[in-house]
Amino acid sequence: MLRKFKEVEPRAQIWWLTLTPDVIPPIVDRILAFTPQSIEILHAVSFDAIYNLDKDREAGALLAGLSARDKKGFALDNGMCVPVDAAAEHKYLTGLFDDLSKMNRKSYQQEIFEICGFTFSGEEYIMPEVGGFKWKLPARKRIVGLNTGAGGRWPSRLWPEKSWVLLARKLRKAGYLPLLLGGEQEHKKNLKLAKQSGALYLGHFSLRQFISEVDRCELVVTAVTMAMHLAIGLKKHIVLFNNIFNKHEFDLYGRGEILEPDFECNCYYSPTCPNNCMQYLSVERVFASCINLLSK
C-alpha cells in the first residue's frame, strides 16, 4: 500500500500505528508503537484519511474515534466490527462465512487495495533496512531456510518434525545448506532438529535480526507466518505450506509454489486437525519443489 499512497499523494505525510515497528520501512514519516502515548497523540490530530485493515476491536475503535475526512476499512460500531463502506464488505463477509471464503479468488493484496479504493498492479513489499548483522555462514553454500513453526494460534498447520529432518538431510545431500528458522517458541524443537538432521541452527533473534537472517537464504520453506511475508518482501523463492486457508489469498509474485497435503480435509480455518493432515504432504514433493525453484 505504501507504494500506492506515495504514487497518489507524493507529498502526503504517512503515519503508521503498529504492534511491530521493526518491520516498518523508513519511507513512513512517523512510526508509532501501539502504546497509550501514541493513541493520545493520534486523538490530537485531524487526518485527511485513515486506513484500518484490521478487524480487531481495538483497531476498529480507533478508526471510529479518530478524526479524519475519509475513513476506509473496518470500524467498531456498538462493540461490533463493521465495514466502513461497500469496498470493505467483501473482506468482511469472507471473514464471517466459510462458504464465501472458499469461493474467494482474490489475493490478500487485491483485497486490501480494493478496500482502500485502488487496484492492485503487482506492487512489491517495501522492507526496512536491516544491515549491520554479521553471520557465520559458509561463503559458497546456497542456503535454504526451513521455518519450522506455524504460530501458536493454528497448530493444525505444523509439518511433522520427522519430515523436517528428512527434508534437511535431502537438501544437505544435494549440496545445499539447510538453515533452521524460528522464534523462541521453536527454539527447543530446532535444537533437536539440528541434532537429528545436521541442519544449521543459529538460534532465535530479535525481529530485525531475524529479517537479516531470512535475507541470507535463497529459498524459504514455511507455513503462512511472518517468515512468509519477510521472504516475499525480500524477494526470495518460497515453498509455502497451506492446509487451512484459501490458497488464492497468497500472491508469491511468481517466485514460489504453494503446496497442500494430498488429503481431503475439513480443517478449514481450524486450530486443530483431527486427521493431522499435514502428514500427507510428502517430503519428496517439498524437496522437488525446492529443487525446481532453485534451478530458476
Residue ranges and their predicted role:
Residues 1-296:
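Catalytic machinery of carbohydrate-active enzymes
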